[in-house]
């Protein structure tokens, strides 16, 4: 089963799905849904449409350069069927997919880490500018506790003197 890629959004197209446009020069364009086909007919650039994978890669939101992408290349050379080779290939595909998932997750975390550091710096700057608005929660409590203690001591002394 061959899974094609959408020309516009780079999404997967499974057999029996999507549509195909063949230009006069025999160039084949495959689309996963009518949304992609309409945008193609309007001559929109996939790198400028925010929901496409081309935009995400161009904007640095997704991993673009990695050795694991080499395994996805199309190979049109027929190979004689061998059960051992087939099993090894399937195991290798699973392993490559695991590695790719880990690398993508790490890439996303590194991308988010930069934003968190930037946000932290901005928060510190804002607190320094508006420090007068922040009042320490225990700022007036010390005097209040001291006054209560003095008042209780006086009451105790008054009670002892009364009998």
Curated annotation (Swiss-Prot):
Its main location: nucleus. GO terms for biological process: ribosomal large subunit biogenesis. Gene3D superfamilies: Ribosomal protein L24e. Keywords: Nucleus, Ribosome biogenesis. The keyword Nucleus applies. It holds the Pfam family Ribosomal_L24e. PROSITE patterns: RIBOSOMAL_L24E. One of its GO terms (molecular function) is structural constituent of ribosome. It is found in: Nucleus, Nucleolus. It comes from the Eukaryota. CDD domains: Ribosomal_L24e_L24. One of its GO terms (cellular component) is nucleolus. InterPro entries: L24e/L24_sf, Ribosomal_eL24, Ribosomal_eL24-rel_N, Ribosomal_eL24_CS, TRASH_dom. Associated with nucleolar and cytoplasmic pre-60S particles. At the end of biogenesis it dissociates from cytoplasmic pre-60S particles and is likely to be exchanged for its ribosomal homolog, RPL24. Belongs to the eukaryotic ribosomal protein eL24 family. Involved in the biogenesis of the 60S ribosomal subunit. Ensures the docking of GTPBP4/NOG1 to pre-60S particles. PANTHER family: 60S RIBOSOMAL PROTEIN L24, RIBOSOME BIOGENESIS PROTEIN RLP24-RELATED. This is Probable ribosome biogenesis protein RLP24. It comes from Pongo abelii (Sumatran orangutan). The gene is RSL24D1.
């Amino acid at each position: 089963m061959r899974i094609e890629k959408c020309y516009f959004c780079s999404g997967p197209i499974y057999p029996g799905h999507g549509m195909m446009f063949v230009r006069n020069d025999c160039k084949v364009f495959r689309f996963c849904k009518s949304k992609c086909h309409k945008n193609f007919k309007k001559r929109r650039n996939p790198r400028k449409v925010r929901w496409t994978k081309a935009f995400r890669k161009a904007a640095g939101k997704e991993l673009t350069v990695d050795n694991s992408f080499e395994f996805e290349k199309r190979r049109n050379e027929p190979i004689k069927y061998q059960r051992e080779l087939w099993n090894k290939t399937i195991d290798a595909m699973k392993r490559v997919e695991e590695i790719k998932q880990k690398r993508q997750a790490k890439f996303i975390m590194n991308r988010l880490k930069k934003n968190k550091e930037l946000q932290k710096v901005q928060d510190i700057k804002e607190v320094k500018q508006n420090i007068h608005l922040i009042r320490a929660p225990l700022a007036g409590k010390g005097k209040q506790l001291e006054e209560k203690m003095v008042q209780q001591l006086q009451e105790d002394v008054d009670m002892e003197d009364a009998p």
